[in-house]
């Protein structure tokens, strides 16, 4: 996956979250969504390509880039665990991360800006970048706008841009209508038969 190819979020047709929070959104959207797109963390090859592209897009990495590396099966386990941990955090669940302490660095740019930059190499650097962006989003009050679609088969990560932060679907027409239709059918079944069911043929 190159920088010009769609991100894990872009392949779903979902708008990217602002600034570095997009990195967190992209991690969450690496999963298989209803069998429509593959899990990008399913193999070492796909995970390695995806990680390189993601870190190259990250604001703290744009000046120097990142050398390619080959993640191991153990690295894949760590990346999937990281994805589960961030997902649990968005669900409001207790999180027991594999790495309770993650390193990051404060970098001063020539222009005088101070940035929180990821530390380490490979998957460790990616984990550092993810938690750094979660921290920054929590500090600037944008974390509450990153959500998982309430349609369980989807669960895509999206950034809620509504004024009152009331969005629950990544796309109302796609997932909102589908869930409402299922709920309507369930209510009708509970009260009797659906239209056209149980009638003489």
Question: Predicted segments — roles?
Answer:
Residues 146-151, 167, 172, 178:
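Residues immediately within or flanking Cys/His clusters that coordinate Zn2+
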Residues 1-148, 152-159, 193-201:
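Short helix-coil boundary/hinge micro-motifs
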Residues 160-167:
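Short linker/helix segments within small regulatory modules
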Residues 80-83, 87, 167-168, 178, ...:
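Short, cationic motifs built from Arg/Lys/His that form the positively charged side of catalytic pockets
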Residues 165, 173-192:
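Basic DNA-binding region of bZIP-type proteins
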């Amino acid at each position: 996956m190159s920088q010009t190819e769609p991100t894990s979020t872009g392949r779903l047709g979902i708008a990217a979250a602002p600034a570095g929070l997009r990195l967190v959104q992209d991690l969450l959207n690496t999963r298989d969504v209803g069998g429509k797109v593959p899990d990008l963390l399913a193999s070492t090859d796909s995970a390695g390509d995806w990680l390189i592209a993601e870190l190259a897009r990250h604001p703290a990495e744009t000046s120097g880039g990142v050398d390619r590396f080959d993640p191991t099966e153990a690295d894949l386990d760590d990346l999937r665990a990281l994805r589960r941990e961030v997902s649990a955090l968005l669900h409001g669940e207790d999180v027991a991360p594999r790495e309770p302490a993650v390193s990051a660095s404060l970098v001063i740019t020539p222009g005088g800006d101070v940035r929180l930059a990821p530390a380490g190499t490979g998957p460790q650097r990616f984990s550092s970048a993810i938690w750094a962006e979660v921290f920054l989003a929590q500090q600037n009050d944008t974390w509450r706008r990153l959500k998982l679609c309430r349609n369980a088969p989807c669960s895509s990560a999206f950034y809620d841009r509504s004024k009152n932060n009331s969005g629950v679907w990544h796309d109302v027409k796609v997932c909102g209508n589908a869930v409402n239709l299922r709920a309507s059918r369930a209510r009708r079944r509970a009260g009797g038969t659906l239209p056209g069911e149980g009638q003489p043929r």
